[in-house]
Amino acid sequence: MSRVAKAPVVIPAGVEVKLNGQEITIKGGKGELTRVLNDAVVVSQEDNTIVFGPREGVTNAWAQAGTARALVNNMVIGVNEGFTKKLILKGVGYRAAMKGNAVGLTLGFSHPVEHALPEGIKAECPTQTEIVVTGCDKQLVGQVAADLRSYRQPEPYKGKGVRYADEIVRTKEAKKK
């Protein structure tokens, strides 16, 4: 039995929830998110909470209910507060700048890298070596941050590359003669 699924999701003030069968739409100040939930999950709205439970006769229904509850909770937090990922560029000549709806990166390649941002994601560069990715969809914010990091991951000897602000890069010792 899922302990996560047992806890209801509390809907804060200013957040609107619409249930249409297995499709749930959540609207708030930061945007609107829609998700189709698994058929093994029973969803109902009671006052200012969303309650999840398993459908009878389905083997992994509690597990699916816990997953659905976690996803919907992230949707509620996203449309209310939003999610943020901060990236730091470390290395000589490594720079970031906004170019319209794309992030322009200079990462030591023979060409500049431009990463187009998907709809619903905003990015800003407070300094030349920082990128802040924000949005209401937690999965999409994390994916865009991971895509930006993948252009030049931190290398293990000097730690040069694109890293998350809270990431600790373990460095190796150089080879000795």
Swiss-Prot record:
SUPFAM superfamilies per the UniProt record, alphabetical: Ribosomal protein L6
Gene3D superfamilies: Ribosomal protein L6, alpha-beta domain
A molecular-function term among this protein's GO annotations: rRNA binding
Assigned GO CC terms: cytosolic large ribosomal subunit
GO terms under biological process: cytoplasmic translation
Protein task: This protein binds to the 23S rRNA, and is important in its secondary structure. It is located near the subunit interface in the base of the L7/L12 stalk, and near the tRNA binding site of the peptidyltransferase center.
Record note on quaternary structure: Part of the 50S ribosomal subunit.
PANTHER family: 60S/50S RIBOSOMAL PROTEIN L6/L9 (PTHR11655), LARGE RIBOSOMAL SUBUNIT PROTEIN UL6M (PTHR11655:SF14)
Similarity-based family: Belongs to the universal ribosomal protein uL6 family.
Cited HAMAP family: Ribosomal_uL6_B
Protein name: Large ribosomal subunit protein uL6
Organism ancestry: Bacteria, Pseudomonadati, Pseudomonadota, Gammaproteobacteria, Vibrionales
Gene from which this protein is expressed: rplF
